[in-house]
C-alpha cells in the first residue's frame, strides 16, 4: 500500500497538523498511512524582515505573494516530494467534491500552497502548472483551513483508515454507493422515543427490503429538497 505524502507551504506552520492530528486522520498519521512535512514560506522571505509579499502591479487593494519567494519555496518542496501535484486553495478554482477527491488520490504525492493576503502572483500558477481548488463560494483569510478540509476528506478515503471500508458506500455524494450520489438519509439511534419524538417504525420492523427502500426514498426526497442539482447526475 502506497503512503500519501503531503507537503504544505504556509506562513503559519503552527496551524498543522491541527485537526488532522486527531480522530481518524490522527490515527492514520500514527499508523503511517499518510505523512506530511511543512515548509515555512517565510524561510525564503526577503530582507531581514522575511517579507513574502508586495504591492500589486496595476493598483488594487491588498498585497500579493511574490513569485521569487514562492518559487524558491516550491523548488524546496519538490526536492522533498518528487513528482508531486501542486494544489492552491482559491475561490477561483474548481469546486472540491467527493469525485475531485478521488481524482486527487491518483497521485500519492501532493503539495498544498496556502496563500495569504490578496493571493499569489499568477506566474507561479503558470510556471508550476498549479491546480486551483475551491471549497465553496465564500472567502477565507488564507489557504490553511481549506487545506485541512481537503486533506481530511482525502485521508478518510485511504485504505485502512476506516475500520469498515463499506461505510463509504452509504455516505452522501458517493455515486457508486447506496444513495447514488445523493444526500444521506435521516439517521436514528437509541432511545426509541426521545422528547415525544419516535424513531420511524419501519426502522424497527426488521424487514431489510422495506428499510432499504425507505432509506433510498428518504435520500431522494432530501436531495430534491436541499440539493436538487445533484439529481441531474443520477
From Swiss-Prot:
Transmembrane segments: none annotated. The keyword GTP-binding does not apply. It comes from the Bacteria. The keyword Phosphoprotein does not apply. S-adenosyl-L-methionine binds at residues 115, 135-140. One of its GO terms (molecular function) is tRNA (guanine(37)-N1)-methyltransferase activity. Its EC number is 2.1.1.228. One of its GO terms (cellular component) is cytosol. Keywords: Cytoplasm, Methyltransferase, S-adenosyl-L-methionine, Transferase, tRNA processing. It is found in: Cytoplasm. It catalyses: guanosine(37) in tRNA + S-adenosyl-L-methionine = N(1)-methylguanosine(37) in tRNA + S-adenosyl-L-homocysteine + H(+). GO terms for biological process: tRNA N1-guanine methylation. PANTHER family: TRNA (GUANINE-N(1)-)-METHYLTRANSFERASE. Specifically methylates guanosine-37 in various tRNAs. Belongs to the RNA methyltransferase TrmD family. NCBIfam families: PRK00026.1, trmD. Homodimer. HAMAP family: TrmD. This is tRNA (guanine-N(1)-)-methyltransferase. It comes from Rickettsia prowazekii (strain Madrid E).
Amino acid at each position: 500500500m502506497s503512503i500519501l505524502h503531503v507537503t504544505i507551504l504556509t506562513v503559519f506552520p503552527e496551524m498543522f497538523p491541527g485537526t488532522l492530528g486527531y480522530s481518524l486522520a490522527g490515527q492514520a498519521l500514527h499508523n503511517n498511512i499518510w505523512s506530511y512535512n511543512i515548509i515555512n514560506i517565510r524561510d525564503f522571505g526577503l530582507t531581514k524582515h522575511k517579507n513574502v509579499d508586495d504591492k500589486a502591479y496595476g493598483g488594487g487593494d491588498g498585497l500579493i505573494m511574490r513569485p521569487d519567494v514562492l518559487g524558491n519555496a516550491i523548488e524546496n518542496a519538490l526536492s522533498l516530494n518528487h513528482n508531486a501535484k501542486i494544489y492552491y486553495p482559491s475561490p477561483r478554482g474548481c469546486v472540491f467534491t467527493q469525485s475531485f477527491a478521488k481524482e486527487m488520490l491518483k497521485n500519492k504525492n501532493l503539495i498544498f500552497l496556502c496563500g495569504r493576503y490578496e493571493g499569489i502572483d499568477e506566474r507561479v500558477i503558470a510556471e508550476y502548472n498549479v491546480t486551483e481548488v475551491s471549497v465553496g463560494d465564500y472567502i477565507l483569510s488564507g489557504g490553511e483551513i481549506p487545506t485541512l478540509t481537503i486533506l481530511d476528506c482525502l485521508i478518510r478515503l485511504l485504505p485502512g483508515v476506516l475500520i469498515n471500508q463499506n461505510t463509504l458506500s452509504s455516505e452522501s455524494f458517493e455515486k457508486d454507493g447506496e444513495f447514488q450520489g445523493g444526500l444521506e438519509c435521516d439517521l436514528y439511534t437509541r432511545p426509541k422515543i426521545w422528547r415525544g419524538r419516535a424513531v420511524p417504525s419501519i426502522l424497527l420492523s426488521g424487514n431489510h427490503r422495506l428499510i432499504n427502500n425507505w432509506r433510498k426514498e428518504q435520500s431522494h426526497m432530501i436531495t430534491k429538497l436541499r440539493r436538487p442539482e445533484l439529481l441531474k447526475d443520477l
